[in-house]
Amino acid sequence: MRKKVAVVGDRDSVLVFKALGVDVFESIESTDARKTVDRLAKEDYGVIFITEQIAEKIKETIDRYNDKVSPAIILIPSNQGSLNIGMNRINTNVEKAVGANIL
């Protein structure tokens, strides 16, 4: 069974993903974003991209999915630039996997 891919964030940052066939969910409020991420997880989305600005507001929601195989939650910069939250998560996960920070 194929899993779906979604992106959650502000309109200007996520609209371009529509051209790639990714399901786009516009959200700027933390309450909306939390509900959207939880709904997408239940609806069999395998990958959910979330802009760092939204992720910063819904950290506890994202943390609930950290130990689960699906959905994979990947933080991406918005059109306003990066907060380095996504890269820090990658560094932490790589360090857990190999025992040292190789990035």
From Swiss-Prot:
Sorted UniProt keywords: ATP synthesis, Hydrogen ion transport, Ion transport, Transport
Family according to the record: Belongs to the V-ATPase F subunit family.
InterPro entries: ATPase_V1-cplx_f_g_su (IPR008218), ATPase_V1-cplx_fsu_bac/arc (IPR022944), ATPase_V1_fsu_sf (IPR036906)
Gene name of the record: atpF
Protein name: V-type ATP synthase subunit F
Gene3D superfamilies the UniProt entry points to: ATPase, V1 complex, subunit F (3.40.50.10580)
Keyword Transport belongs to the record: yes
GO biological process: proton motive force-driven plasma membrane ATP synthesis
HAMAP family on file: ATP_synth_F_arch
Keyword Glycosyltransferase part of the UniProt annotation: no
GO MF annotations in UniProt: ATP binding; proton-transporting ATP synthase activity, rotational mechanism; proton-transporting ATPase activity, rotational mechanism
Function according to Swiss-Prot or TrEMBL: Produces ATP from ADP in the presence of a proton gradient across the membrane.
Domain of life: Bacteria
